[in-house]
Amino acid sequence: MLPPLAVHISGDLQAVGFKKSDVITSSIPTTPPWLLTRPAVNLTLHCSDKSNTPPEIFKHRFYEICHEFNNYYRIFTDGAKEGNRVAAAVVHRDNTKCVRLPDAASIFRAELYALLLERDVVRSSKENNFVIFTDSMSSLQSINGFNLDSDLVQKFLKDYTVLAKNGKNSILCWIPSLVGILGNEKADAAAKSALSLPVTRMKLPATGVYPRITKLIFDEEVWNCCAGNKLHAIRPTVGDYKQKTENMPIAP
């Protein structure tokens, strides 16, 4: 009889620096989708092909959006990934909040987490109207498509619904990266600077662990092909030596 997957891969999880308690347990959403408020998403700038559109055109259209939502409080979010390090940031006026995620997190998760940080800004602000700018189309598509398989999308939609009921009106707007939009550049710089921060403790979905397990299996197979060298006799298995030397977060 085959053991459950969680039991079957428990050894692999430990080999890549995780415990079963570090992984988010899948669960059915507590709030039915039909009770969640669908976020307002503006994809106006996505209608233009970035490769064939000069940055000045994007900046001009961005200013048009800002003029359209002139009385809205502007917030910019971004995520960054460099090597194994992952971080998220939110920027509004002269304020910045950054978080470094566990190294196994994906850039997609970082972008979503940045949007959750933005929810904290909305919650604590005295303003009631907000326009949130992000260059992550995949995050907006997941939120707009009610991708409830993602724990972060679930949390975002719950927060959005609660805040909307409390009079907080938010519009999510996609903007292209690297075209000279100041707020986006500040958020990008903040996210990259956060890569040097200590890791914030948080659980990750199993999908965030699978790539590490896959790499471990591949490295092990390559290492086993070197059975004739002396080092292999001293260290017969690869494990995740580098990961063991780093400060891996432990789930609270």
Regions flagged by a language model, labelled:
Residues 34-67:
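Charged, flexible boundary elements
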Residues 84, 115-185, 189, 199-211:
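RNase H catalytic domain
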Residues 195-197:
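Acidic, His- and aromatic-enriched active-site or binding-groove loops in soluble protein domains
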Residues 55, 63-80, 84, 203-252:
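Helix/loop segments that flank and initiate small ligand/metal-binding modules
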